From Swiss-Prot:
It is a multi-pass membrane protein. Its main location: membrane. GO terms for molecular function: CoB--CoM heterodisulfide reductase activity; metal ion binding. GO terms for cellular component: membrane; plasma membrane. Pfam families: Nitrate_red_gam. The chain crosses the membrane at residues 18-38, 108-128, 150-170, 184-204, 221-241. It comes from Methanosarcina barkeri (strain Fusaro / DSM 804). Belongs to the HdrE family. Pathway: Cofactor metabolism; coenzyme M-coenzyme B heterodisulfide reduction; coenzyme B and coenzyme M from coenzyme M-coenzyme B heterodisulfide: step 1/1. Binds 2 heme b (iron(II)-protoporphyrin IX) groups per subunit. This is Dihydromethanophenazine:CoB--CoM heterodisulfide reductase subunit E. It is found in: Cell membrane. It catalyses: methanophenazine + coenzyme B + coenzyme M = dihydromethanophenazine + coenzyme M-coenzyme B heterodisulfide.
């Protein structure tokens, strides 16, 4: 078995996080996320009895009934739109053509935020898969530490893509009058959280490597800086999603698939 990979996060250089500790924090975040997601499914399914059936007043929402009804609507034949599920996934959900038609500038901003966020999430999932594979004893042609180093460049690239998207969103809210007037404090808090998550990641990495974002801080604070970024990201980029307006990253794709597209 390969040598244990040293994690960047910790209370100090000596007290680094272990794989088990990271899995505990991750599991807590995922459980909170799933509880909120199921609660939303129950809320959306209130009164639902089935696809094409009349709602039943006072009927308690069921997540299973909601998902069954949603899937029946997704797979039902449409007479006004003939788009396939694959076409909707690519054009409406990934490419976000509805936003492009309304505003190309806003589309670029959304694509940077959505693409950066989801790609970084996928890269983290790949890292987790490699670690789990190594933990259960399956031989790989590389170690988890080598794979983490391999992912460093994509992480930098999509981290900056996310940062650019967030900065554009902040500039729009500050200097575009109609956007500023339509924004409430809750909107500012949400975009501020994403900005803090993104910046804290760059700063934690900069302190550790001494590259650009270190701000002259002592390298000894690199582990707690990385720990702050990790816990903050788990809380607000996973656990918090179903309880905030960011649930739209799940709700909108579900609606687009059920309604056979967004054109």
């Amino acid at each position: 078995m390969s040598e244990e990979m040293l994690y960047f996060s910790g209370l100090s250089d000596v007290l680094r996080m272990t794989f088990v500790q990271i899995m505990i924090f991750s599991t807590i975040a995922i459980v909170i996320f799933l509880y909120g997601l199921i609660s939303n499914f129950q809320k959306w399914g209130t009164g639902v009895t089935g696809y094409a059936l009349e709602p039943q007043e006072g009927k308690k929402g069921s997540a299973i009934t909601f998902l069954k009804t949603w899937w029946s609507q997704v797979t039902a034949e449409s007479h006004h739109r003939g788009e396939s599920i694959l076409e909707i996934l690519i054009l409406d959900i990934l490419f976000q053509r509805r936003i492009l038609k309304r505003s190309p500038f806003r589309w670029v901003m959304h694509l940077f935020i959505f693409g950066g966020w989801m790609t970084l999430f996928a890269l983290s999932g790949m890292m987790f898969a490699v670690e789990m594979t190594e933990k259960i004893g399956i031989a790989l042609p590389f170690t988890p530490a080598e794979f983490r180093d391999f992912l460093s460049i994509p992480n930098y690239i999509f981290g900056y893509i996310l940062l650019i998207g967030v900065l554009v969103a902040l500039v729009r809210r500050l200097f575009v009058s109609e956007v500023r007037e339509a924004s409430i404090m809750y909107d500012w808090v949400l975009i501020g959280i994403v900005f803090l998550v993104t910046i804290s990641g760059f700063i934690a990495d900069g302190i550790r490597t001494g590259f650009i974002w270190s701000f002259g801080l002592d390298p000894s604070v690199a582990p707690p800086a990385a720990l702050f970024h990790s816990i903050f990201s788990l809380l607000f980029c996973i656990a918090f999603i179903p309880y905030s307006k960011y649930i739209h990253i799940i709700a909108i794709p579900l609606a687009l698939l059920a309604n056979k597209g967004g054109e």
